[in-house]
Amino acid sequence: IHESGHAVAALKVEHADPVDKVTIIPRGFYLGATHFLPEKNRVSWWKKELYDQLVVLLAGRAAEDVFLGDVSSGAKNDIERATQIGRNMICEWGMSDLLGNVALDDYKAQQLYAGMGGGEKKYSEETAQVIDKEVKKMMDDAYQKALSIVKENRDKVQLMTDMLIEFE
């Protein structure tokens, strides 16, 4: 169900890369995977492309929620990646309507200096709270869109899941 959610969402949003391969065969730490084949080399991303990436990343969990009535820890990597994209959109790429066109976070520098006495925030606690709210809102909106896509395409998600089980 999880991987089918990703794949169907990618087919339904406007700005996702085409699905190349879907597998439910466990490999390493992953129970399955959905691979995409970018149509072009990218140096930068449009906001609408990044938002659709969030939707696709969260659609696996949305499919679990819709079909199984519960969610698993299997979406850990999807959530981490989506959260990082959302945070970059807000803090590094100025894609927040509330915070505007400013770079608020030098996240990589903070990681580099972690434990070395450096890496303090370059903004107030109030701004940090706004960042957290903006990232959460973006993630919540993307998850709601993923849920809608899965619910509206329940038959396609089920068919894909059945085919993966039968042919893999």
What are these regions (language model features)?
Residues 1, 7-168:
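Soluble catalytic regions of large protease machineries
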